[in-house]
Amino acid sequence: MTMCSGARLALLVYGILMHSSVYGSPAASGLRFPGIRPENEVYDEDGNPQQDFYDSESLGVGSPASALRDAYALYYPAEERDVAHGILNKAYRKVLDQPSARRSPADAHGQGLGWDPGGSADDDSEPLSKRHSDGIFTDSYSRYRKQMAVKKYLAAVLGKRYKQRVKNKGRRIPYL
């Protein structure tokens, strides 16, 4: 197995995930879901039946798969997609062709200072992977903040019930 820098590995994983999310999704491949008919119909607050979103008949609007393809073609023309795929393939080949060698601590220290012992000077995968990892951190942190806000809200709303649970810990009393 080849040893590679974290930035190149992150770029490789990012490329694989993006490729599989775009080309591996059922909507992108044009698959249609069968009409799922539950035994009991679902009604909204006014008593009107809810629409079955998995129906195969359309309402005069294109299918989600065609809308996704149209949006993808609109925002990413074929030339730009080819360039992006070429860049990804080049980075992927570079990672796969890298010789397997154990790096010394001095090499890792030099790399931290911006010095790449075996790489080229025009390697710009570092900023891309840094931006990607920053985005992952931001997403994770915002998800954590949302979870904490929900917990705080539920503690405020269900505070009385929560206190009852703690108070009656050994006894089984239905609360809900």
UniProtKB/Swiss-Prot annotation:
PROSITE patterns from the UniProt entry: GLUCAGON (PS00260)
Q: Which InterPro entries match?
A: Glucagon_GIP_secretin_VIP, VIP/GHRH-like
Q: Note down the stretches annotated as region Disordered.
A: 98-135
Compartment list: Secreted
The GO cellular component terms are: extracellular region; neuron projection; perikaryon
**A Pfam family this protein belongs to?**
Hormone_2
Q: Which residues carry this modification: Leucine amide?
A: L158
Which residue stretches belong to region Important for receptor binding?
150-158
Q: What is its main location?
A: secreted
Please give a single GO biological process term from the UniProt record: neuron projection development
Q: Which residues carry this modification: Lysine amide?
A: K169
Q: Give the propeptide segment as residue ranges.
A: 25-80, 173-176
PANTHER family attached here?
GLUCAGON-FAMILY NEUROPEPTIDE, PITUITARY ADENYLATE CYCLASE-ACTIVATING POLYPEPTIDE
Tell me how this protein assembles: Interacts with ADCYAP1R1 (via N-terminal extracellular domain); both PACAP27 and PACAP38 neuropeptides function as ligand for the ADCYAP1R1 receptor, which modulates the activity of downstream effectors. Interacts with VIPR1 and VIPR2; functions as ligand for VIPR1 and VIPR2 receptors, which modulate the activity of downstream effectors.
Q: Indicate the family of this protein.
A: Belongs to the glucagon family.
Identification of the protein by name: Pituitary adenylate cyclase-activating polypeptide
From which organism does this entry originate?
A: Bos taurus
